[in-house]
Amino acid sequence: MLNNLEQLTTEKVNLETLNIDEKSPLEIVKVINEEDKKVALAVEKELPNIAKAVEKIIEAFKTNGRLIYLGAGTSGRLGILDAAECPPTFGTSKEQVIGLIAGGREALLEAVEGAEDSKEEGIKDLKNIKLTSQDIVVGIAASGRTPYVVGGLNYANNIGATTVALCCNKDAVITRVADIAIVPVVGPEVIAGSTRLKSGTAQKLVLNMLTTASMIGVGKVYKNLMVDVQTTNEKLEDRSKRIVMMATGVGEIEATEILKNSNYQPKVAILMINTGCSFVEATAKLQEAGGFVKKALEYIKEGEEIC
């Protein structure tokens, strides 16, 4: 499995960049930009498979399942980055979306030699978080054959978890061991084999879609507003205020006051303003609507639930 690297699209020489070392800085970045334009188109071809994965993630979230990213190097770091953004953006627990990387925390800052070459390490990391059949495991590997990821996906399959492969080479090993395969083929890299470039960009775009679409699917977004944002700092407190103002049309003073009364929960504040419900009533109605603000407002408007 460690041989025949030259057969991988991500390892081939890019004929468009053969003389990149002779170009000026402006010419170099223009070439990189032209290559990057191919990434979104490659991802577009995989939208049906991305949507299938989103459907499975939504199902998992609704039954207290988790989304687990598993990767090595750049792929692992991208998974951890996406997972880390979910709590402040969508108000999730730190356990709902988890990123695992070969070599552990040390590998976030520097390469850990040989960490990705062990199938057993991938299995061990999933066992350490007590993976269950309710969870979704997304194995991320540009090459599609990283042993750490292959081992983890096989283990996840064995315990009945749903598995997703995200790679940038057709017919890769992980696509054959996963329930769903997402394969944006971005072509040879600007610098041959440097998959932190187009492959990494494609992976980031896909991960953005997986979490964003899934969070929308479980009521974390109202219209296009992140109404479950956690107000953990001044910037996010200001954002929460603006979200309430945009969703309800009230001014800053009223939005600030209701936000305080709602324990800084934009969802609850929006319901309180738009329906006249108390904090307790709005919280209850929101729960009845499964966390969906729009659905809760519709229930109240239809007279099914009246504060």
UniProtKB/Swiss-Prot annotation:
Lineage: Bacteria, Bacillati, Bacillota, Clostridia, Peptostreptococcales
Name of the molecule in the record: N-acetylmuramic acid 6-phosphate etherase
Subunit structure: Homodimer.
Alphabetized UniProt keyword annotations: Carbohydrate metabolism, Lyase
Signal peptide residues on this chain, from the entry's feature table: none
Pfam family, one: GKRP_SIS_N
Family: Belongs to the GCKR-like family. MurNAc-6-P etherase subfamily.
Domain SIS: 57-220
Top-level division of the source organism's lineage: Bacteria
Recorded metabolic or biological pathway in which this protein acts: Amino-sugar metabolism; N-acetylmuramate degradation
Active site per UniProt: 85, 116
Cross-referenced Gene3D superfamilies: 1.10.8.1080, Glucose-6-phosphate isomerase like protein, domain 1
Record organism: Alkaliphilus metalliredigens (strain QYMF)
Function: Specifically catalyzes the cleavage of the D-lactyl ether substituent of MurNAc 6-phosphate, producing GlcNAc 6-phosphate and D-lactate.
GO molecular function, one term: carbon-oxygen lyase activity
